A protein has these predicted regions:
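P-loop NTP-binding core
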Residues: 1-276
């Protein structure tokens, strides 16, 4: 059994020991993942993190997508960075050295940059390459209550690193046609990582996003998702909102950009559900 061209080379005992690192942490480490692009993954990561920070949780967002949308969406220019998560993955620096504060109290981010795209190739021959992020986050686990990892849409070494580092997976699903396309593959890949690298991993949360109450389609998709995933689906849905779409261009989460809009209220409620 293999992932990304046979990237599972560690012995089963070593893999299990390394995979158990995340279970001993104080922070909850949540990978926000969906193998489809354009499903509100980064929007959910940013705004869920900001809403959790408002609830006095110490939150770290790890931008593991080379597009760096979570970075810029939190008001940080990826072009002006001296180092980013790319250098962390190559073990050239630490999370502590690259972490950036945001406008939101209690919310920090490990920024990304376009250079991260090269990490997929550079890590191919690296020892214990699936555990680079896991080991890096272990050093700051006591500094945060929640660590959210914004995964790239493709299943490569970056996403595998996120799944190995995480204890749970949150999947945003847009309430639109083809919403479930590729979802079975994602669940299957999570199971592969669980069996081979991280026995504690589970899909814990499904968030319904881009919900349009004016259409029957949104409700039909929501019903289908709830039938498939049961109580893992959050009760709170995230509405389709122009304000949610505008906020990233201003480098702010919706809780700052428009604190009283429907999107901000919805993400605060979603945060309460996820926090439990």
């Amino acid at each position: 059994m293999s992932l990304t061209g046979g990237s599972l080379h560690l012995s089963s005992v070593t893999s299990m020991m390394l995979g158990m690192l995340s279970q001993n942490r104080r922070a909850r480490v949540i990978a926000v993942a969906n193998q489809k692009g354009g499903v509100g993954k980064t929007t959910t990561t940013i705004n869920l993190g900001a809403a959790m920070a408002e609830s006095d949780k110490r939150v770290l967002i790890v931008d593991l997508d080379p597009q760096a949308n979570a970075t810029t969406g939190l008001g940080i220019s990826s072009r002006g960075l001296q180092s980013s998560v790319y250098e962390v993955m190559l073990q050239q620096t630490t999370v502590t050295e690259v972490v950036c504060a945001t406008e939101v109290p209690n919310l920090e981010v490990v920024p990304s940059s376009l250079a991260l795209a090269g990490a997929e190739i550079e890590l191919v021959t690296a020892f214990s390459r699936e555990h680079r992020l896991d080991r890096a986050l272990e050093t700051v686990a006591d500094d945060y209550d929640i660590i959210l990892i914004d995964c790239p849409p493709a299943l490569g070494l970056l996403t595998i690193n996120a799944l190995v580092a995480a204890g749970e997976v949150l999947v945003p699903i847009q309430c639109e046609y083809y919403a479930l396309e590729g979802l079975g593959q994602l669940v299957g890949n999570v199971e592969l990582v669980k069996e081979n690298l991280n026995p504690g991993l589970e899909v814990s949360t499904i968030a319904l996003v881009m919900y349009d109450a004016r259409t029957n389609l949104s409700e039909q998709v929501a019903e289908e998702v709830r039938t498939f995933f049961g109580d893992k689906v959050c009760r709170q849905v995230i509405p389709r909102s122009v304000r949610l779409s505008e906020a990233p261009s201003f480098g702010q989460p919706i809780t700052l950009f428009d604190p009283t809009c429907r999107g901000a209220i919805a993400y605060r409620q979603l945060a309460k559900e996820v926090l439990g």
